[in-house]
């Protein structure tokens, strides 16, 4: 995900990003966030609820943003930092899977899925 570019922003009852890397290690990653999360831009943090479409308008500017790093923490948090200083932070939800990250890694197309579990924790498939 690091060094990748956001090629798609998806808005429905959740918020999604598709991130592509174009170097020799070409990879594709999709993030889907289903619960409230923090969006930081210009030093200001906003809590966004994907169930309220009007709150997601500022996220459209993430299209073509460069990703500095993205990682999941064992306690169920997901963090994505962008090169321009923006960030997305997702905390675990007590009742629902708060986020899912899926993708493919080279050199052999190897698919994976990470899921932020209800309560705390992360599940890895693949």
Each PLM stretch: what is its role?
Residues 1-126:
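Surface-exposed, interaction-prone regions used to assemble/regulate multi-protein complexes
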């Amino acid at each position: 995900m690091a060094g990748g570019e956001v090629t798609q922003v998806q808005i429905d009852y959740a918020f999604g990003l598709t991130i592509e890397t174009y170097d020799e290690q070409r990879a594709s990653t999709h993030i889907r966030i289903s619960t409230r999360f923090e969006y930081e831009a210009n030093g200001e943090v906003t809590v966004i609820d994907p169930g309220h479409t009007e709150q997601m308008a500022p996220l459209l500017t993430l299209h073509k943003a460069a990703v500095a790093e993205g990682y999941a923490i064992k306690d169920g948090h997901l963090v994505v930092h962008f090169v321009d200083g923006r960030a997305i932070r997702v905390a675990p939800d007590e009742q629902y899977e708060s986020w899912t990250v899926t993708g493919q890694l080279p050199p052999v197309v190897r698919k994976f899925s990470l899921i932020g579990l209800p309560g705390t924790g992360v599940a890895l498939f693949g």
